[in-house]
Amino acid sequence: MVNTHPTPATGHPTTQPPQLPEPPEPSGPYTADTEAASWPVTTWQGWQHFATTEPPAPPQPGQAPRTREERLAYHSAFVTVRTPAINTLAHQVRTLMILGRHQQITARPSLIVTGPPAAGKTTALLHVGRTCHLAHTLRTPPTQGSAHPAVPVAYVLVPPGATAKTLTTEFARYLGIPTTTRMTQAQITDAVCHTYNTAGIQLVLIDEIHRLNPRTTTGAQAADLLKDLTERIRATFVYAGIDVTTTPLFTGVRGAQLAARATLIHCGPLPAHHGQTRPFTDTLTDLENALDLHHHTPGTLPHHAPYLHQRTAGRIGSLTRLIRQAAITAIHNGTEKITKATLDAVQLDHHAETHHRPTTQH
């Protein structure tokens, strides 16, 4: 926890270097410690657990067969395939972190990941954040005898109806900075900025940014707070939200300020064709190669690419949910393979079912 003490002159808290509890030990797949796993990823303990836990991996040649329960757990978690949006975001984050490394006066360049629901925005954000975390710990391992592990990445969710105080409190909660109802927003902000810089945060990921509405008084104050934080915290900020360019975030004076500092990355549906490539079919191939089913016929998913593209509208979130549910069904019913009938039987989210399920041909 971070200790705050009021100064005699101002009564404002001054923060001591962060006293962070030891993170959970890295664990193998599907054996996460219950207590460690209970921390949300919007706390640094939860983030450490997420970043250092080995992600699900497909079966490897020569590997002992997994049990039924292990395979069910594997398809429940499943792999993250590298989509074009993830590749673009990873490249841009790496470049902007270098670009802003020695920028001291004004806010560093930022990124905004935008797109429709179920397009993989949060997945891309978390994947790039984990990569940054692991790269930093490899580059700068903890000093011998150090009580505090590195905290290079912060992940914050914008709360519904965010005000400046509730938003800055979310920043404080991530590092366990104690706050009270009697503390002013300025006091919490001072503690957050000091502690984030002391802890060495280099990348701040802010999800659900579309929840901010600068057209309201409280929303405008929250947007101003974000601008203040980007200027005071020595880190690269990456935002993600639903169709951000069509929201009030990009309009008016405040919107113009954000648009002038941020590079936009569109995380949209995977196209069936892009020039000479087939991004959607390539993703299907990657997902199929990751399956752990005993009797699945290779090539089945790419063969049904037109049907799957229409069914999911090319959205990676809907697609991975469909494949995961179909795989779990195949294990449960003993067929151990995904067929067109298996895919047809899966009920997806309401939006996909209402707008994109192909009409049955008679």
Question: Where are the predicted features?
Answer:
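Phosphate-binding P-loop
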Residues: G100-R108, S146
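Mid-core helix/loop region of P-loop NTP-binding domains shared across ATPases and GTPases
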Residues: A51-P65, H148-A150, T163-E170, P178-T236, ...
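Conserved lysine of the Walker
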Residues: K121
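N-terminal pre-Walker A segment at the start of P-loop NTPase domains
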Residues: A77-I98
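Post-Walker A helix-loop "phosphate-sensing" segment adjacent to the P-loop in P-loop NTPases
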Residues: T131-T143, I177-T179
